[in-house]
């Protein structure tokens, strides 16, 4: 570098910029100024950074140049900063034909070249450049005859290596970034930081949680980059001080992808040796890319390893090493020693190769003509709207020509495209935008994982490695991410669960099994979600583990299976040769990835590429071989939800038990009557004990068949045995399996109660027979039959009720069609053939016919026909929806009239209905926080009840022997014919058994899940999708509801509110103004221009307007043009003759003090229409005040007052001038949704605080808030600050619900306690939101909170039922309330236990009576209370307010928003107004670029 050259940099603040057009204008104009080398203008920072020659320009002259363009420029720091330069020495080749002065003039015209010196004798050119603007490669491209003089560079580098290289080079920085969870985070950071001025390259590693940045320190500082990363929500700190690069391009790329080592600071490259060899190793035990990175980073640290490339797919590693220093066997052991030390390595080959000698002292210079292979990354872009292979070819053809694109593969079946690209030349966002520009909907996949490919350098390009020595025993273990990287998920249907103890039993035991990471069991849904390691365990084994616990288990879904996997039943196979024939034939077909045929089961499992081949093609191939093939039928029914099998089981069990119980009950009643009769005789006649015994024995049932065995006890025993052992067999099996795994549940309590009663009775009976007792013992043989009757009745009723709780989900599942009619069309859309196929065989792009009354089998787009479609069960929309060509249809909706042909766009699990079903199922599987308490309580319930039962037995035995009168007083049916001891024991056992019978953990376990299941189902039926029990429970705790503005409170689309006709000396008609303005704005791409054109076409009832020429846009001001050919349009509709009925318009006499209406026709143009007049031109100006003033027009105070009034209401006022006459004013605004004011009022009446949060300016925000009745507003809040604002509200102790569009507001939705995504239609898989409202209706926000409150109230009622039965019933059963006459028999306790579970489920079913309130039901009582707020009642907080601000710099999202924010006034901005601009409503995938809208308004 030559410091004397003196190139400076200055930063100038620029006010008045409103959009990117302003930026472009300043850069173009100032960039042409003599002496200006480079200029970069930032809209969000409102400044311009200029690199200039101080000999030709000064900061003051540059400031004045910007001022002259109509902007306000201010220099805050008058001291310019020096800019680093460098000198290149270029040698002229012998083939040079150009004159020296031509070379000099050519190079001096190049931006970034400050000086040139020519040495003809030495055939050398010394070029002084600014490295941040131009480089040697660009100089060579300008003059190909020049080549870099490496010798001169060596001398210069050796002379002042530290100084010059540090100044002229770039700096590499390693920064630790925390909080990243997925590759979307890395892409966001790379996209935003990579676009900052001075940042050359950036690579963010998710595994290492760090960012490697190559930047120019004179343009950006470390602190600025750190603040930018933290502004995105990721904590960042510098891991290592930045170092100036002294490396070539290859080394930089390698450095960016090499983890930081903790040893010496200076980086050196591993040398290449003359006897380098290459060895290939097979490595088993790698599971993920983290393993690959671990092996590569560890081996590359070895001193004698030149390079290593590890392939996860091929399980191999190719290592280049110095054969004289290390052997392949040593390398093999080194790989096996890499943490965690589980790799198995074998050597396959060794190839000898030679390379250049190393340079031990300094880095070898890389010749300039050696071009390194750049980084290659891979991104997946989801593409909607493709209908055929022509679309695929079109996208591939256009995108493949884009700069930086290496390859592209578009899949019609998967609706996505995989692009390999150079991240230094393009980005995923750019590619996505390019696809959208072609007319398709494109979004970046959440699963994008950058694939970094670095070319293996030749001997001329050695790799950079660390100087660290390799070590093994002291190595820091690498975090094992096997669970996250190598896990699969399956769903298992579980039957036989009765309470929360069963859930806890399954979860606890399965977590102990090797290979199972987590398990979540849903009692009500009867489903278990299991995450497991497929290398260790498979779903059938998991199901078997559950069956061993005593429950039924069936694998119902494998979450890893999806498109590309086919399971078929193949009939006609006789031997192994048939199997071989099918497998070999299929694997020869292109697109078949894997095929396995099992002769024993007659099943074929096939993996295929859906881009190349489809399931119908595979079936046809098998059938062509002479076999029959059909799809394995999947159970699409909701049989596991309606509990039909369980209902049948318990109904049968109840009837069997009842058959034996009725005689037992008859005997018991008979004995009770007789005991009462004898007690009366004893009381009246004062009979002795002997007389009582004789009287009892005279009864038929008390007669002894054998000594000690009465007829009564024999009959009771015979009736009890079948019930005890056959009716109770199910309970014995379940109790045994539970106890085997050291757990206890309701079945254990039942078995204990019945077994103790039966065993006690049998033992006492055998003892009496052995002793030949004359008095018959009192037994409990009547207890087991009566217990089992009430238990079976309770379970029967409980499962009936459970089936009712799942009706909503069952209805959704029943909507799924089973078959589809696929048709074949010719080129003229004439039907050629029809074919009925299973819905699983439908592929994307198929043409499907749907007849009247039929269900749509898949999501699709109508290509032919008109009809009305019933979507009520999916969206909650009661009225049928009209469908025409181009309309989208939803799977499961019903076609009412008219046949339709649709093109399938989403099939299988990707359909809207499948997504809704999946979401509701997962919601009903999840557990609410309050349920976790119940589950924990149930785990201790059974042991506690057993303890209470034993304690009751012992206490009553002790009380009986100490004070027999108590037992005698409260023992029902006591007679003096039995001994005291027997009476005490029987009474104690009766109380103990009753305690076991009445206790019911089931009611506690059912209280929450039944209510959650019914609540989520009712919500789904009403178009409110609640993602689980937690948001359902949390919503009732919400105290603050925060609304986004654009698209939530408002429609999000600008519309014309009012057109005023202004007259001075001449007048012009309303329709003529519309024709002129509509024609003029038809060339505008701005949302406001589009809104004006749309309005004009609607008012004029035409699709074609006049002709617009000489169209010009002046950013920040307005447009000018000339309009012709409108007279024919006006004459056609007879509007040019008379214009008496002017809609939404008035005429204003601007030279008078008052408005006055006019019905006169235009006087500017004569009413006679002729061919000559058709060619008449109108000079049109449309814009703001400043634009009119610039063009010499005077704005009267009355007109200015009109504009101010509109601006106060948050509208944009645009002036129209025709032929230099001010003749019209158009007011445009984003309109408030009709139900918004009512919804806000209802929320306030529910005791909730309502807040409006918007990025729009304060005046517009205040206007919208006043219209809907919101008194607290946060305006000008950037997207990155919305999260901070929500967090601030939460720190005040408030539970916050955030209502937004679910896309741009996703960070705030995730931060809020309850995120509500509104108006997303069929996009029901928004991860950030907790509640998804299918319909774009704000009253559904009210309904979701109301439903939550009703559900939580029902849960509390359920707990009251459960606790009453247990907390009150158990003490009664134990005899605590005997002094007041409350005594329970065991059968009574059993009936109470059964009633508790049934009552809880029936209580939850009351939620099915919930009806979402309608607009009319809300509107009538609120009519008198609703009123707009005055501006003085509204509190507006601007910006981030008092929350801490991480960075003054804006992120990419904020910059895009700012680019598109300028309000209607600022589009055409004059600095006096602060009105807002509204956006057009683009599709949801285009919100990130182009016509982006956050909740702000875009610039014209």
UniProtKB/Swiss-Prot annotation:
Motif placement: Endocytosis signal: 1467-1468, 1487-1488
Swiss-Prot/TrEMBL catalytic activity: Cu(+)(in) + ATP + H2O = Cu(+)(out) + ADP + phosphate + H(+)
| Effect listed in the UniProt record for changing residue 873 to R | In MNK; increased protein abundance; does not affect interaction with ATOX1; does not affect interaction with COMMD1; increased localization at the plasma membrane; does not cycle back to TGN under conditions of copper depletion
- Effect ascribed to mutating residue 1300 to E: In MNK; impaired copper-dependent trafficking from TGN to post-TGN compartments; subcellular location restricted to TGN; impaired copper transport activity
Known outcome of mutating residue 1304 to K = In MNK; impaired copper-dependent trafficking from TGN to post-TGN compartments; subcellular location restricted to TGN; impaired copper transport activity
Which stretches face the Cytoplasmic side? 1-653, 735-741, 803-936, 1012-1356, 1406-1500
Where's the active site on this chain?
A: 1044
- Give the consequence of mutating residue 1005 to R: In MNK; impaired copper-dependent trafficking from TGN to post-TGN compartments; subcellular location restricted to TGN; impaired copper transport activity
Segments forming domain HMA? 8-74, 85-151, 171-237, 277-343, 377-443, 488-554, 564-630
Write out the topological domains of type Extracellular.
676-714, 763-781, 960-989, 1375-1385
Residues holding Cu(+) 1: 18-19, 22
Q: Where does Cu(+) 3 bind?
A: 288, 291
Q: What is the effect of changing residue 1282 to E?
A: In MNK; impaired copper-dependent trafficking from TGN to post-TGN compartments; subcellular location restricted to TGN; impaired copper transport activity
Instruction: Give the first-level EC class, as a single word.
Output: translocase
Instruction: List every position bearing Phosphothreonine.
Output: 152, 327, 1212
Q: Topologically, how does it sit relative to the membrane?
A: Multi-pass membrane protein
According to the UniProt record, what happens if one changes residue 844 to H? In MNK; loss of protein expression
Q: Which residues bind ATP?
A: 1081
> Would you name any one GO CC term?
neuron projection
Q: Which residues are glycosylated?
A: 686, 975
What keywords is this UniProt entry annotated with? Answer: ATP-binding, Cell membrane, Cell projection, Copper, Copper transport, Cytoplasm, Disease variant, Endoplasmic reticulum, Endosome, Glycoprotein, Golgi apparatus, Ion transport, Magnesium, Membrane, Metal-binding, Neurodegeneration, Neuropathy, Nucleotide-binding, Phosphoprotein, Repeat, Synapse, Translocase, Transmembrane, Transmembrane helix, Transport
PANTHER family referenced in this protein's UniProt entry, alphabetically: P-TYPE CATION-TRANSPORTING ATPASE (PTHR46594:SF4)
* Listed name of the protein: Copper-transporting ATPase 1
Q: Lineage of the native species?
A: Eukaryota, Metazoa, Chordata, Craniata, Vertebrata
């Amino acid at each position: 570098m030559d410091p004397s050259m003196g190139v400076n940099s200055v930063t100038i603040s620029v006010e008045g910029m409103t959009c990117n057009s302003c930026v472009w204008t300043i850069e173009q104009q100032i960039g042409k100024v003599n002496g200006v080398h480079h200029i970069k203008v930032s809209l969000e920072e409102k400044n311009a950074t200029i690199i200039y020659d101080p000999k030709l320009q000064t900061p003051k002259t540059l400031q004045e140049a910007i001022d002259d363009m109509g902007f306000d420029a201010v220099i805050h720091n008058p001291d310019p900063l020096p800019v680093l330069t460098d000198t290149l020495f270029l040698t002229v080749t012998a083939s040079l034909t150009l004159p020296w002065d031509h070379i000099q003039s050519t190079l001096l015209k190049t931006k970034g070249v400050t000086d040139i010196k020519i040495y003809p004798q030495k055939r050398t050119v010394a070029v002084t450049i600014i490295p941040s603007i131009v480089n040697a490669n660009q100089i060579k491209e300008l003059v190909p005859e020049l080549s870099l003089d490496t010798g001169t560079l060596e001398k210069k580098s050796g002379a002042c290596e530290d100084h010059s290289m540090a100044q002229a080079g770039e700096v590499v920085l390693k920064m630790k970034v925390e909080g990243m969870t997925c590759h979307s985070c890395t892409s966001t950071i790379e996209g935003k930081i990579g676009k900052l001025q001075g940042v050359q390259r950036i690579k963010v590693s998710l595994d290492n949680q760090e960012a490697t940045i190559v930047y120019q320190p004179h343009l950006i500082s470390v602190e600025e980059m750190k603040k930018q990363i933290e502004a995105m929500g990721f904590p960042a700190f510098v891991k290592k001080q930045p170092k100036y690069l002294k490396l070539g391009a290859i080394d930089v790329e390698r450095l960016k992808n090499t983890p930081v080592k903790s040893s010496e600071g200076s980086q050196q490259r591993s040398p290449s040796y003359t006897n380098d060899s290459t060895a290939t190793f097979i490595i088993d035990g790698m599971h993920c890319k983290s393993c690959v990175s671990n092996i590569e980073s560890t081996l590359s640290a070895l001193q004698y390893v030149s390079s290593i490339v590890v392939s996860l797919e091929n399980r191999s590693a190719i290592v280049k090493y110095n054969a004289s220093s290390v052997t392949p066997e040593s390398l093999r052991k080194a790989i096996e020693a890499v943490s965690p030390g589980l790799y198995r390595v074998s050597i396959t080959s060794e190839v000898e190769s030679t390379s250049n000698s190393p340079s031990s002292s300094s880095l070898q210079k890389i010749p300039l003509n050696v071009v390194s292979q750049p980084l290659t990354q891979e991104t997946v872009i989801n593409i909607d709207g493709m209908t055929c292979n022509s679309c695929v070819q079109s996208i591939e053809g256009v995108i493949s020509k884009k700069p930086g694109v290496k390859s592209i593969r578009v899949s019609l079946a998967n609706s996505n495209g995989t692009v390999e690209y150079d991240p230094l030349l393009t980005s995923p966002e750019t590619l996505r935008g390019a696809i959208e520009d072609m007319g398709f909907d494109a979004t970046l996949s959440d699963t994008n994982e950058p694939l970094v490919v670095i070319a293996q350098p030749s001997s001329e390009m050695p790799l950079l490695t660390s100087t660290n020595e390799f070590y093994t025993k002291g190595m820091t273990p690498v975090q094992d991410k096997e669970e996250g990287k190598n896990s699969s998920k399956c769903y298992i249907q579980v039957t036989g669960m009765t309470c929360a103890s069963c859930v806890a039993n399954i979860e606890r035991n399965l977590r102990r099994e090797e290979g199972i990471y987590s398990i979540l069991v849903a009692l009500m849904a009867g489903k278990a979600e299991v995450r497991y390691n497929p290398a260790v365990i498979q779903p059938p084994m998991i199901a078997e583990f559950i069956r061993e616990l005593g429950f039924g288990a069936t694998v119902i879904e494998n979450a890893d299976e999806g498109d590309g996997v086919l399971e078929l039943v193949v009939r006609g196979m006789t031997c192994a040769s048939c199997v071989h024939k099918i497998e070999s034939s299929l694997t020869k077909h292109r697109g078949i990835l894997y095929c396995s045929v099992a002769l024993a089961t007659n099943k074929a499992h096939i993996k295929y590429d859906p881009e190349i081949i489809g399931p119908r093609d595979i079936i046809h191939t098998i059938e062509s071989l002479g076999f029959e093939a059909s799809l394995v039928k999947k159970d699409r029914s909701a049989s596991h939800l309606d509990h039909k099998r369980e209902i049948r089981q318990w109904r049968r069990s109840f009837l069997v038990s009842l058959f034996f119980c009725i005689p037992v009950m008859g005997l018991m009643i008979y004995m009770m009557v007789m005991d009462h009769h004898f007690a009366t005789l004893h009381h009246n006649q004062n009979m002795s004990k002997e007389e009582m015994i004789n009287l009892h024995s005279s009864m038929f049932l008390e007669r002894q068949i054998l000594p000690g065995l009465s007829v009564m006890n024999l009959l009771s025993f015979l009736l009890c045995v079948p019930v005890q052992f056959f009716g109770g067999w199910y309970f014995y099996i379940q109790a045994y399996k539970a106890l085997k795994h050291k757990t206890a549940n309701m079945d254990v309590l039942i078995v204990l109660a019945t077994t103790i009663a039966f065993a006690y009775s049998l033992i006492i009976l055998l003892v009496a027979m052995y002793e030949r007792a004359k008095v018959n013992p009192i037994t409990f043989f009547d207890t087991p039959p009566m217990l089992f009757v009430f238990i079976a009745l309770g379970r029967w009723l409980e499962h009936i009720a459970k089936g009712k709780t799942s009706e909503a989900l069952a209805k959704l599942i029943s909507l799924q069609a089973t078959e589809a009619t696929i048709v074949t069309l010719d080129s003229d859309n004439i039907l050629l053939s029809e074919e009925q196929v299973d819905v699983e065989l439908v592929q994307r792009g198929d043409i499907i016919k749907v007849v009247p009354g039929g269900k749509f089998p898949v999501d699709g787009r109508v290509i032919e026909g008109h009809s009305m479609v019933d979507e009520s069960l999916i969206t909650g929309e009661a009225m049928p929806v009209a469908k025409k060509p181009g309309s989208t249809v939803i799977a499961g909706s019903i076609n009412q009239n008219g046949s339709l042909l649709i093109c399938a766009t989403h099939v299988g699990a990707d359909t809207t209905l499948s997504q809704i079903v999946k979401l509701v199922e997962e919601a009903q599987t999840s557990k609410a926080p309050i349920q976790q308490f119940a589950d924990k309580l149930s785990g201790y319930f059974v042991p506690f009840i057993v303890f209470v039962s034993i304690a009751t037995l012992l206490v009553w035995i002790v009380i009986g022997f100490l004070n027999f009168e108590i037992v005698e007083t409260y023992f029902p049916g006591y007679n003096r014919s039995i001994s005291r001891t027997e009476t005490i024991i029987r009474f104690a056992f009766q109380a103990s058994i009753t305690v076991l019978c009445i206790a019911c953990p089931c009611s506690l376990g059912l209280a929450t899940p039944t209510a959650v299941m019914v609540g989520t189902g009712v919500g789904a039926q009403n178009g409110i999708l609640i993602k689980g029990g937690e948001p359902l429970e949390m919503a009732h705790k919400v105290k603050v509801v925060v609304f986004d503005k654009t698209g939530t409170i408002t429609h999000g689309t600008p519309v014309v509110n009012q057109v005023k006709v202004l007259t001075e000396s001449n007048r012009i008609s309303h329709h003529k103004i519309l024709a002129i303005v509509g024609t003029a704005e038809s060339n505008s791409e701005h949302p406001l221009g589009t809104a004006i054109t749309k309005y004009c076409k609607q008012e004029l009832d035409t699709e074609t307007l006049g002709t617009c020429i000489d169209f010009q846009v002046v950013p920040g001001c307005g447009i000018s043009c000339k309009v012709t050919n409108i007279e024919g349009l006006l004459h056609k509709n007879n509007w040019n003759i008379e214009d008496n009925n002017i809609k939404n318009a008035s005429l204003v006499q601007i030279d008078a003090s008052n408005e006055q209406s006019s019905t006169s026709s235009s006087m500017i143009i004569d009413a006679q229409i002729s061919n000559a007049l058709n060619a008449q031109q109108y000079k049109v100006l449309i814009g703001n005040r400043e634009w009119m003033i610039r063009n010499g027009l005077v704005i009267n105070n009355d007109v200015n007052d009109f504009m101010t009034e509109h601006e106060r209401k948050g509208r944009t006022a645009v002036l129209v001038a025709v032929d230099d006459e001010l003749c019209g004013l158009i007011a445009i605004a984003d309109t408030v949704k009709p139900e918004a004011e009512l919804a806000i009022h209802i929320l306030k009446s529910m005791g909730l605080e309502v807040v409006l949060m918007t990025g729009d300016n304060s005046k517009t925000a205040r206007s919208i808030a006043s219209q809907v009745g919101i008194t607290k507003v946060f305006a000008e809040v950037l997207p990155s600050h919305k999260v901070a604002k929500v967090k601030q509200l939460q720190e005040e102790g408030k539970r916050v619900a955030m209502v937004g569009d679910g896309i741009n507001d996703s960070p705030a939705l995730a931060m809020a306690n309850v995120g509500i995504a509104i108006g997303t239609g069929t996009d029901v898989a928004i991860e950030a939101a907790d509640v998804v409202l299918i319909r774009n209706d704000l009253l559904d926000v009210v309904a979701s909170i109301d439903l939550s409150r009703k559900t939580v109230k029902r849960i509390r009622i359920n707990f009251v039922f459960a606790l009453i039965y247990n907390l009150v019933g158990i003490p009664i059963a134990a005899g605590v309330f005997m002094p007041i006459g409350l005594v329970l028999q065991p059968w009574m306790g059993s009936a109470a236990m059964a009633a508790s579970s049934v009552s809880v489920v029936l209580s939850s079913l009351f939620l099915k009576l919930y009806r979402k309130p309608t607009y009319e039901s809300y509107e009538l009582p609120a009519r008198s209370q609703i009123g707009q707020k005055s501006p003085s009642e509204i509190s507006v907080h601007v910006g981030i307010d008092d929350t801490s601000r991480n960075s003054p710099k804006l992120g990419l999202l904020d910059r895009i928003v700012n680019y598109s924010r300028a309000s209607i006034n600022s589009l055409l901005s004059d600095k006096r107004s602060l009105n807002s601009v509204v956006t057009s409503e683009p599709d949801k995938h285009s919100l990130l670029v182009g016509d982006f809208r956050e909740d702000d308004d875009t610039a014209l």
